[in-house]
Amino acid sequence: EGFGGDAYGFGLYPGQYGMALLSKYPIDVDDILTFQTFKWHHMPHPQVPIIPDESGSTDKGKPWYDVEEWAALRLSSKSHWDVPVKVAGKTVHILAMHPTPPNFDGSEDRNGKRNFDEIRLMADYLSPDKGAYIYDDNGEKVSLSENARFVLVGDFNAADIGDKHREGVIEQLTEHPLVNNDIIPTSAGGAGASGAEFSNRFTAYWGARADYVLPSRFGFDVNDAGVFWPAKTSDLYRLVKDREASSDHRLVWISLSLTEDN
């Protein structure tokens, strides 16, 4: 039908909206973990999409997915990764994901619920006591080790403020005790893109902080951070001026220094 809603994740062809990681540091390929095939119903207390009744209540509503669909459906709409990278003798876990946007659905809120649980999967993975249910694409139970250095990266499709903010979603990560969200990346271009007082933190031209680079509190000092979104007066604005130039999202960067393990 020209639409990708009949796939595990939206796409008009296999691999659309795929993920890639480029690193100037060596990647520990043998220890990469992926969670693409983790079944949504295997998450404890998942946010099951329910079609509301005529009154708007979901108490007696019908599940959006039938039994066969729900049993087969993956949680990850693209993939979830734990990629260990070796930096100066230390291991840094790149925790990457691209959850589905929380819209393009109906009153059952299937994409909103999936976005919440995709983010929850990564939040639970940070805490072995909460993530004991998680298995990788080899079917092995896995968790992040205590005092691991990590950086969460990706288009999380979850705003932290404004009219696109859904309370309690991105906070699963930004307010997680192991995650450092103290420095919020900003840009001059974002500041001029909207009248909102917080628009300097936007990472997408449609007005939201949707893309994140969140380091662990353990193991790093944060030197600086920003969003590559030049102001219209900059010579570099040509790189982001429209969709013909580049993405509707902006590059988010952070400068980190390794600290001692103790």
Label every PLM stretch briefly.
Residues 1-91, 99:
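Structured beta-strand-rich core segments of catalytic domains in phosphoester-bond hydrolases
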Residues 18, 95-97, 153, 215:
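Generic beta-strand/beta-sheet core signal
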Residues 24-45, 52-54, 75, 84-85, ...:
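Metal-dependent phosphoester-hydrolase catalytic domains
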Residues 70, 105-107, 163:
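Short, structured coil/loop segments at alpha-helix boundaries
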Residues 92-113:
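Active-site His/acidic residue clusters
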